[in-house]
């Protein structure tokens, strides 16, 4: 199960002041999920701009473990200012993933910064039975497979294309949300079918 951290931990002027909220959430019993616990998403307000010192301090607040259980953190910055090499470098240093978003309103940052990948696809179409056109699902299946095998798709926007990720197998988490939401389960199943057949 993937979790979305509460907004009060990240919707603040100074991210680095969220330590108590981060700790309260991490100690709220999430470790009870055991090996079923997936990534923890920290979603920033769309108005939150990149401040390297503050962002770096926030990343340091994210604990590596809870009650002995390894935690995997992913941040979703939704302001264009985060689409820069410095933000990517800070996440890579912390081992924190950045959401690879496919959205109309938010920047795409497809740089691999952790040992897993987390994508949020937000361009679904309720008029299509599978939520996404077949060609788009084919493309995302190909990207997911490439990520899982340790590669980096070259058709997505990266903030720091000069840096290549360490080539290693990765878990890949892909979510269909927002637009065409009623069709999201169908999109997920259609994507899984393509991956199973690959």
Say what each PLM segment does.
Residues 2-198:
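Residues lining hydrophobic/aromatic ligand-binding pockets adjacent to catalytic sites
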């Amino acid at each position: 199960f993937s979790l979305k951290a509460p907004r009060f931990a990240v919707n603040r002027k100074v991210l680095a002041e969220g330590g108590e909220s981060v700790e309260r959430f991490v100690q709220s019993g999430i470790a009870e999920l055991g090996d079923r616990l997936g990534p923890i998403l920290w979603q920033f307000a769309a108005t939150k701009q990149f401040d390297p010192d503050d962002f770096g301090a926030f990343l340091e607040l994210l604990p590596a473990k809870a009650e002995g259980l390894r935690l995997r953190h992913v941040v979703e910055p939704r302001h264009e200012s985060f689409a820069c090499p410095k933000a990517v470098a800070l996440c890579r240093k912390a081992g924190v993933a950045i959401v690879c978003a496919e959205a109309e309103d938010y920047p795409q940052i497809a740089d691999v910064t952790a040992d897993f990948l987390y994508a949020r696809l937000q361009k679904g179409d309720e008029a299509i039975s599978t939520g996404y056109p077949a060609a788009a699902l084919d493309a995302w299946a190909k990207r997911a497979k490439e990520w899982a095998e340790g590669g980096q798709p070259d058709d997505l926007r990266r903030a720091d294309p000069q840096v290549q990720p360490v080539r290693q197998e990765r878990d890949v988490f892909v979510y269909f949300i927002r637009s065409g939401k009623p069709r999201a389960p169908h999109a997920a199943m259609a994507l899984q079918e393509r991956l199973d057949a690959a």
